[in-house]
Amino acid sequence: EEFAASPVDNLELPEGLFGTACHALIEEGLAGRPFALPDALAGQVPEGAKETFLAEARRLALTFLDSAFRKGFDSMPRRASEKGLIVGLPEGYALSCRLDLVFESEEEIVVVDFKSNRTRVPGEYDLQLAAYKTACRMLAPGKRVRAFLYWLRADRAEEVLREAGLEELLDLARAAALGPQDEAAEEEGPSLL
């Protein structure tokens, strides 16, 4: 599935920069702060592209912030952006996750993963979000856990129903440990995500 073209599609940008900028502006908006990119991000945007880049990142951030989907979680008392989780797996492995946005109540955890991609490939991120759900369940047993992809360009939430059991995650960890790794991965140890 192809989403509508964006003015940033033709800009020469470092990979992932636009999505990171959208996430940063969403985080600012959720915290009630004015939309401003951190200097570290703003400095990576080519000089002639800054106005277009920032306008489009703001537009997509507002799409989420103003959405009925986001407002549907206003009653949940706890919220965190860019939440890091590390949970232990058998055999000394660990599952490391960085959740874009998490809402939590006494009964439920809702994970939201933002995507600014132009193309949606069905199932492409299902295992990633299934692993996030497993990590949340391990850290908060008994709570209902749901996970959603939020396609910023389409203003659409998509619930990911796939589950990943502990054995599947352990199999992935074993495979990752056996496969080729770069120097940074060797220093950090096995990682699934």
Model regions: which residues?
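Short amphipathic C-terminal alpha-helix that caps PH/PH-like domains
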Residues: 22-25, 129, 173-177
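Anion-coordinating catalytic cores for phosphoryl-, nucleotidyl-, and glycosidic chemistry
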Residues: 12, 142, 180-182
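A generic alpha-helix structural signal
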Residues: 57, 61, 65, 133, ...
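Acidic, low-complexity intrinsically disordered tails
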Residues: 1, 158, 170-193
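Mg2+/Mn2+-dependent nuclease catalytic core
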Residues: 89-169
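Nuclease catalytic cores
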Residues: 1-99, 103-105, 126, 191-193
